[in-house]
């Protein structure tokens, strides 16, 4: 992509309305623009990141055998009345009436609707298990939306719902999804800790939240120090990880620790995923019954699995930034490489830049080629801000000798590279980052 053709409205100054780092950087880098309180338009750069995260989440769900569906944003209120949640959910639910006086709502979650779909289409234990998921925009009328997309009113979620014949099988499915979540966050290039948590208004009696460690997090987490080993060695078996202690502040009890207090550490975290074993709460209330192997009607056992995709964008920034801007993990970066031509009027600079752009694009490497006619300092500031993992910097002096500068955005290390060796180096770096995005 040529920067001269791209829509990238970067801001030089910090927006006064932004309180946290991710909100500031998302506005400054031209990822989003606010349309109303807690409601944002995603501009091209932000949308690319959102789609990259969405595709990684989708890929891992598909690998786990889940099947994608798409439920509507707008839901009939009668389903929520039937499940018993309509009056209890509170003012966060946006309700309205259509021209026929039917009460509708903008869905904040989908347990009620997916239960309705299940009960009308699956009747026998032979059709189980099933795991259905969708990726859809949701709305919660937050009383005080803040922190940009971290706590907005409109947000993109991946929600999955599993159905099993009994509790034993439901817990097996839950454990499989626990592993899927660990693998998903690995692939996203983030370090997420699974903590024991409350089920909240969803219901049920088994629950884990997944938190990205960040100083700006709202939650305090207490966890086994071995999680730090996991961060440095992501190949540790998931079964081993599942046995390690980790709890939210609400669930942490120093009098009931399975390990010594000296083996525990604490950090602030940002919740980006939550999984629940619900049991039969919705199936009983909504009469979602199946014939078991003895011909007896029994309520189906359910679990729910959510990942906040738009929230993840902000959380990843909070955990991956410096004073200059964002440092994207390679897996979610909108562009893997920023190609910076410092002098578009110098024929040698342009020759090397166009050669690099052509060679890398031929390898399906996403490159943002800065072919704009602005001063070098402005170019450096823009590309450090938007956070491509690697930068190729081409200036007249070194270009005369077929040399370019190669910068690792995360480490800040810059080295001189012969133009003929550039493609091989970048492909090697991207492979290494893919194997360990931390």
From Swiss-Prot:
Q: What is its main location?
A: cytoplasm
Q: Where in the cell is it found?
A: Cytoplasm
Q: Which reactions does this protein catalyse?
A: tRNA(Pro) + L-proline + ATP = L-prolyl-tRNA(Pro) + AMP + diphosphate
Q: What PROSITE patterns does this protein's entry cite?
A: AA_TRNA_LIGASE_II
Q: Which cysteines are joined by disulfide bonds?
A: none
The lineage's top-level taxon is Bacteria
Q: What class of enzyme is it?
A: ligase
* GO MF entries: ATP binding; proline-tRNA ligase activity
Q: Does the keyword Cytoplasm apply?
A: yes
Keywords assigned by UniProt, alphabetized: Aminoacyl-tRNA synthetase, ATP-binding, Cytoplasm, Ligase, Nucleotide-binding, Protein biosynthesis
InterPro entries, alphabetically? Answer: aa-tRNA-synt_IIb (IPR002314), aa-tRNA-synth_II (IPR006195), aa-tRNA-synth_II/BPL/LPL (IPR045864), Anticodon-bd (IPR004154), Anticodon-bd_dom_sf (IPR036621), Pro-tRNA-ligase_IIa (IPR002316), Pro-tRNA-synth_IIa_bac-type (IPR004500), Pro-tRNA_synthetase (IPR050062)
> EC annotation?
6.1.1.15
> In its keyword annotation, does this UniProt entry include Nucleotide-binding?
yes
Please give the GO cellular component terms listed in this UniProt entry: cytosol
GO BP term (any one)? prolyl-tRNA aminoacylation
What is this protein's function? Catalyzes the attachment of proline to tRNA(Pro) in a two-step reaction: proline is first activated by ATP to form Pro-AMP and then transferred to the acceptor end of tRNA(Pro).
How this chain assembles, per its entry, is: Homodimer.
Concerning its family, UniProt says: Belongs to the class-II aminoacyl-tRNA synthetase family. ProS type 2 subfamily.
Please identify the protein, giving its name as recorded: Proline--tRNA ligase
Species annotation: Rickettsia canadensis (strain McKiel)
Which gene is this protein's source? proS
């Amino acid at each position: 992509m040529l920067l001269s053709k791209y829509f990238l409205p970067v801001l030089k100054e910090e927006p006064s309305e932004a309180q946290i780092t991710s909100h500031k950087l998302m506005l400054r880098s031209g990822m989003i623009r606010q349309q109303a309180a807690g409601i944002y338009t995603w501009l091209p750069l932000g949308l690319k990141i959102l789609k990259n995260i969405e595709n990684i989440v989708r890929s891992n769900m598909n690998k786990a055998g889940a099947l994608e569906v798409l439920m509507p944003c707008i839901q009939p209120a009668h389903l929520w009345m039937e499940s018993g949640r309509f009056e209890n959910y509170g003012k966060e639910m946006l309700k309205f009436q259509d021209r026929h006086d039917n009460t509708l709502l903008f869905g904040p979650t989908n347990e009620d609707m997916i239960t309705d779909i299940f009960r009308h289409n699956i009747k026998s234990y032979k059709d189980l298990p099933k795991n259905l998921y969708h990726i859809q925009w949701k709305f919660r009328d937050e009383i005080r939306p803040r922190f940009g997309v971290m706590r907005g009113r409109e947000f993109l979620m991946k929600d999955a719902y599993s159905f099993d014949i009994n509790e034993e099988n439901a817990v097996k499915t839950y454990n499989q999804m626990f592993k899927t979540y660990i693998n998903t966050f690995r692939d996203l290039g983030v370090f997420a800790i699974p903590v024991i948590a409350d089920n909240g208004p969803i219901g049920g009696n088994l629950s884990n939240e997944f938190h990205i460690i960040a100083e700006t997090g709202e939650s305090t987490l207490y966890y086994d120090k071995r999680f730090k080993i996991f961060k440095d060695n992501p190949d540790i078996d998931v079964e081993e990880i599942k046995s390690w202690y980790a709890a939210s502040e609400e669930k942490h009890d120093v009098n009931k620790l399975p390990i010594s207090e000296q083996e525990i550490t604490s950090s602030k975290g940002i919740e980006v995923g939550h999984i629940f074993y619900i049991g039969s709460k919705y199936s009983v209330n909504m009469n979602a019954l199946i014939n078991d192997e003895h011909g007896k009607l029994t309520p189906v056992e359910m679990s729910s699995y959510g990942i906040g995709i738009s929230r993840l964008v902000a959380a990843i920034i909070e955990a991956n930034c410096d004073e200059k801007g964002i440092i994207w993990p390679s897996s979610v970066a909108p562009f893997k490489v920023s190609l910076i031509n410092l002098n578009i009027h110098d024929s040698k600079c342009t020759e090397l830049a166009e050669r690099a752009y052509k060679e890398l694009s031929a390898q399906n490497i996403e490159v943002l080629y800065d072919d704009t006619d602005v001063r070098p300092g402005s170019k450096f500031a823009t590309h450090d801000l938007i956070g491509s993992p690697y930068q190729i910097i081409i200036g007249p002096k070194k270009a005369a000798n077929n040399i370019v500068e190669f910068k690792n955005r995360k480490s800040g290390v810059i080295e001189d590279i012969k133009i003929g060796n550039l493609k091989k180096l970048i492909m090697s770096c991207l492979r290494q980052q893919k194997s360990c995005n931390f």
